[in-house]
């Protein structure tokens, strides 16, 4: 019983203590419990606003630092120092002769004219009817505060043809001894260190006095008047006392040339003078030219002969039949024909120190319309075919260059300057079909081939299986129209054709058709195609193609797969030529001539799906200004012409083979070439520059030797826009289209290593140096420079600024970090 009471008391005490704790301070927090299970993922929240664009990432550093000085807008920007104005030192303007007046009783005419410039057009362009913001009359030359400049003034009459077999010709009125000369004005304030007028006046053969007339400014910006000193009616024939040669009934041409280097401009005006006793203004008249200045400048870019003579119409006022030096005629027709044909026809002609056989002409000399045309004009210049003359014809056709194919005398017998060539050589009743002058010249195989090529078109229908590891398959068609498209083009049979243009397909025959495949489009290298020296895959269409007899399409499949790991795009090209007999040619009336059909290319995706044609770098139309219809390697490779999709055409078919990996090592003799070298790069950018600057030998198919060391470039080598894409005819500033890419730059191979298929042991020149030094210093790339000291300085300059020579691509990549 006692025990029970004690237990009860203990419980009560404990309970009482517990009840008392509820009113005490809060105790410390207990430890966290275990983490519960992860709840379900909540719904995705709304997309936040686009953040600000971050700074551009840093591009890989290029070892070559050319753009530091030669970039756009820099101290020596490439665009600013490589253009027509800089290279030719020409600021071209126009001279507009507004009228010529003659005093009564004497013939000392006054010429009124306006100087326009400097941005009023190229030589031969007519002055605008009214000034504009960019083209207006100028006080010449305003830049050095010389108020009255020096001008040269010529005057000549157009004499009638002396016989039925000749043409009208110009007769100069002004002579110094026996040579045609110009009068010259001496501007006020223009003096030499001796205090004498700086105009070097000539001496009249008639009066024995200096020919310096009077130049005045009647008022108005750019307006001038010149009073001739010579009385044209008192002029005698050179070297004789024959009475006056002046004839006011004949067309008379007045010409003006600027007399210093502030502005290069010529101007002419043809008038019929009034009777001597009457006087008054000359009546303007029009004379159809034989050649247009614009035609000359298509190839020469900007002719400036004797310093400042830029207009063909001005040239003929001196280069007339009367001009003879050293027994050689300086007559325009003789001189120009002989110079342009000299190398091809081996003519023994030299005038003014220019030897005809030292001039290389970049197309067939029989293509008369290259010069005898007026680009952009609807006026045909057909005197060459409608009025053939002894003088014109025999300036080319001398010795064995006339007559039968094997050479020989003129088949029509002896001819003289009085002979009437048109009796046999006309277009209506020619002695034979080929006696028609136009037909005769167009019968040359090269000209026939160019004309016939317009009847064919290549078409790439599809390109499939272009992913890495696959073997590309190409479907193509050849289209034909018998008249260049007047009748619609339609597919023609190619494989298995007999008796037609594709049947001459024996080895070395006139018919050849291939598909080439190269990669990648950014820079063709063709790495991994198992073809020697970086060459593309080539597929023989005529002998391996599978033909569809319904639509005449052909399918060819590569035997080589696209390399593993390749990305980007590849390019497919169709190249080759049909064979067509030339019925007009005595050399090949039945033998087929190779026809240079325009090649076509098509890009195909290796990775991804997008395709883009290879970048345009040069303008094919500019190539053809000189080369007429550029086609190489036996008329197989003919660059694509400009079109809607390719506004500048394309030389991709050239660059596929002529790439950074390639040299001519496989074509050269083992002992070396005629230049003493074992190989030469054929990288397009370096090779083309070197060819046009006359400093390279290239070995081609079959070991053929192409020695370009005597090429005479007809323009200005430093005028990059002569070939490259540029925005307008004056091309300033120039748009350079080979931009430095933001990836590793592939150097130009100058020496292929022992592995002729692989490229890791190729020795190279870095990219910028390879292209710049192909002109500026040839020692490292083309060892034929005539100025080794200058070449060494330029190479040292390039090396100092990051260029490398004799490096592998791995070494170049290591530099470009």
Indicate residue ranges for each PLM-predicted region.
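Extended surface/linker regions that mediate inter-domain or inter-protein docking
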Residues: 107-382, 467-769, 774-780
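Low-complexity, acidic Ser/Thr/Pro/Gly-rich terminal tails and inter-domain linkers that flank the onset
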Residues: 83-104, 443-469
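A eukaryote-biased signal for short, well-structured alpha-helical docking elements
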Residues: 60-88, 415-452
